[in-house]
Amino acid sequence: MRIHGEAFMARLLLAFTACLCGTTPCQAQELNAKIMVNHSQIQGTDASVFDDLQQNLTQFVNERQWTNLQFAKNERIGCNINITVTKYDKGTNVFTCKAVVQANRPVYNSAYTTTLYSNTDNDFNFEYAQFEQLQFNEEQVDNQLTALMAYYAYLIIGMNLDSFAPMGGEDVLQRCLNIVNNAQNLNYTGWKAFDSNRNRFAIINDYMDGAMKPFRQLQYDYYRNGLDAMSTNAERGRANVTTALETDLKQSHEDRPLSLLPQIWTDYKRDELSSIYKGKGTQKEKQNIYDILFSINASQNMAWEKIKE
C-alpha cells in the first residue's frame, strides 16, 4: 500500500470537511485487518467455532465504516490482530484470550512499511456463540467482543491520522476514549483505571492526556517529517527524526514518567531506530539518541548499543 503524502492528506481533509457539511455521501472503509484466531491450545473442541469467529471478526472490522473519512482501497490502514485462545468454555461461550494488535503505515514514496502501533492485550476475553451476529452501538456499549474491536479500530485510525497531521486523529481518538468510558459496566478486566498501567484504559487515557501532547506530536514529527522525508533526502529525514526524539519523546517521558507509552513505543521501534543511526550521523548525535532511549527503555539496550556503531 502506497500513499502519496500531500494528495492523501488533501483528500482526507476534503472528505472530512464535506462530511461535516453534509455535501457528499461518505462511504469508505478505513481498515484492512488480518485477524487470526490461534486455538492450538484448545483440545477436543470442534474447530469450526474458531474459524467462524475469525471470519466474523474480519468481516465486522473491514466492512464497517468507522468514520466519515474516505479512504481509497489502497489507502486502507493495514493492521493485524492475532488472538490466542488459552481457554474456551463451550457451555458458557466464554473465551479467555490474549491478543497482539499491530498497525502499519506506509512510508511516502517508498516500499517500506513502518509499525505504527504494536502491543499485547493480555485481557482479551469475551463471550461468543457460533454464528452470532455482531452488533455494536457506540453510545450503549453492552457487548465485550465488539467493544474490543471498536476500541482498537478507533485507536489505530486515530494514531494513523495523527501521523499525517498534528493531532489529526483527535475526533476519532475521542471516540476510542468514549468506548472506554461506556464500557465501565462490562464485567471484564482491562477497561478500568488502576487495574494496570498498560491496559486499554491506560493506553488511550495517557495518549489523550494533555501532559502527553508531546507524545502525540511525536507521531507527526517522526513519521511525516522524519521517515516520509527520507526518500528524497535521507540526511534531512534522519535529522528530523533526531529532533522528534530529542524534543517530543524526551519531553513526554519527563512530563509523565509513569506512563508506559514511551516504553511501549520504543519496544516496537527498537530495530527501526537502531537501523536509522547505525553507521550514520555524528557521534554526538548518536550518543544523545542513545541516552534518551536508554533512559526510557533500558531493557532494549542491545538495540541501542547498535546506534553507537
Segments (PLM) and residue ranges:
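N-terminal secretory signal peptides that target proteins for export/translocation
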Residues: M1-M9
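Sec-dependent N-terminal signal peptides
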Residues: L12-C21
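Sec/Tat signal peptide C-region and signal peptidase I cleavage site
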Residues: T23-A28
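Start-of-domain marker
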Residues: Q29-T96, V107-N109
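Sec-exported extracytoplasmic/periplasmic mature domains
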Residues: T58-W66, G158-D162, S274, K278
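Acidic/His-rich structured neighborhood in mature extracellular/periplasmic domains
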Residues: G91-I204
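Flexible, glycine-rich surface segments
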Residues: A165-L258
